[in-house]
Each structure stands twice: as C-alpha cells, then as structure tokens.
Amino acid sequence: MNNFKGTFITFEGGEGTGKSTQSKLLYEYLINKNINTILTREPGGCLESEEIRNILLKGNLDKWDPITESLLHNAARREHIMKIIKPALLANKIVICDRF
C-alpha cells in the first residue's frame, strides 16, 4: 500500500521552454493559497545533491566514464528523494520539481 499522501508535480522539457518559470509561478500560487508546498529541482535539490552536481560540472565534461557519471547522477537523485521529496510527500505536502 502507498503511504504517500502528498502530490509530486514535475515540469519537464527542453532548454528555454519555461520549466523554471512555470514551476515558480505554480509554487507562488499555491503558497498564496496557504497550501503546504515545496519547490525543488534536479539536478540538485539538497546539499548533498548539489555537491555531486558541482563535481560533475567542474572541468572537462568528458573526464567521467559514462557508468561513473550515471552512478553519480543516481547518487544525487537518491539523496534528493530521501532527504527532500519523500519526507515532504509523507508530510502531505505538494512537491514541485523543476525537472526530475
């Protein structure tokens, strides 16, 4: 049985299509309606995920073996889910994510 009570909304799309803008607009709208909502993003979303993101973005983009890079991305996502998304959903919050 699913114990999650909250709602997860993600905005997806190519670069420059308005994902961040629409995420922020929806977040502001829900907050103004006093609806318990958080706004987060991927890649990143929590301190640990941001640290991994920064590791991946520094220097030569081809320095990582594809499998290593994939594992780092998955580690960042796991931290984001366990530290931000899952607790918010269990607390019956709406989670808006700029990409996922």
What do these predicted regions represent?
Residues 19:
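Conserved lysine of the Walker
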Residues 1-6:
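Phosphate-binding P-loop
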Residues 29:
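Rossmann-fold NAD(P)-dependent oxidoreductase module
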Residues 22, 26:
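Hydrophobic positions on the alpha1 helix immediately C-terminal to the Walker A/P-loop
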Residues 9-11:
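Hydrophobic anchor at the beta1->P-loop junction of P-loop NTPases
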Residues 16:
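Walker A (P-loop) phosphate-binding loop of P-loop NTPases
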